[in-house]
Amino acid sequence: MSKTRRMVLIAMLAALSTILLLPILQFPLLPGIDFMKVELSIIPVLIGVFTLGLGDGFIILFIRSVLWYLLFNQGPSTWIGVPMNFVALGIFMAIVWFFTKKKFSIKNYTVGIVLATIASVLVMMVLNVFYALPLYRLAAGFDVDKIFAGATHLFNMGSLSVTLNPTYLLTVVLPFNALQYIIFALVFGLIVTVFKKNKVVKFYNA
């Protein structure tokens, strides 16, 4: 693939990924938890990973994240949430790619998806405790500890208060993210199957 064609494909996938961030295309998963919604912007990024390579996939993810800041900035929810999203999705796609880069089979894809989902969910839980929730509490006045009982204060980091809330983590963060990554896996798996069958695009070792 020529350098020009590669750059055009990166730009197109980044643009498509950004379009999928439109609020109208997002949807909640858990009843009563409207502040956490699924967006499918990772799908074009995964297509980039498996057609161009992991490095270009991260470039697409980075461009999408920058455009998210510029086009859909909603204050603290954006500047706190986007870095978390970048880290978790980066881990997810890197693990899936690692297990399928030699051969894209159902077995390898399933193993990759399961391990990637577990890793990404754990990372999101840790980031919620030590990064997101303290910042939301300070910058936006949003304190989940007032909604979900059972929080334990851990320590202070300057003006940030770090707490551990097992109720919120186990009933919201864990199921939401697990379901979200399962949706990503099913949608991308379907796309790979359709693209392979119709020879729309060549995936790595697929």
Swiss-Prot record:
Pfam families: ECF_trnsprt (PF12822). It is found in: Cell membrane. Disruption phenotype: Mutant exhibits altered transcriptional control of the riboflavin biosynthesis operon in response to riboflavin and FMN, and does not consume riboflavin from the growth medium. Keywords: Cell membrane, Membrane, Transmembrane, Transmembrane helix, Transport. It comes from the Bacteria. Inhibited by FMN and roseoflavin. Its main location: membrane. The chain crosses the membrane at residues 7-27, 42-62, 79-99, 113-133, 147-169, 173-195. InterPro entries: ECF_trnsprt_substrate-spec, RibU. Belongs to the prokaryotic riboflavin transporter (P-RFT) (TC 2.A.87) family. Forms a stable energy-coupling factor (ECF) transporter complex composed of a membrane-embedded substrate-binding protein (S component), 2 ATP-binding proteins (A component) and 2 transmembrane proteins (T component). May be able to interact with more than 1 S component at a time. Riboflavin, FMN and roseoflavin, but not FAD, bind to RibU with high affinity and 1:1 stoichiometry. Riboflavin is stacked with one or more Trp residues in the binding pocket of RibU. Probably a riboflavin-binding protein that interacts with the energy-coupling factor (ECF) ABC-transporter complex. Unlike classic ABC transporters this ECF transporter provides the energy necessary to transport a number of different substrates. The substrates themselves are bound by transmembrane, not extracytoplasmic soluble proteins. Mediates riboflavin uptake, probably also transports FMN and roseoflavin. This is Riboflavin transporter RibU. It comes from Lactococcus lactis subsp. cremoris (strain NZ9000). The lineage of its organism: Bacteria, Bacillati, Bacillota, Bacilli, Lactobacillales. The gene is ribU.
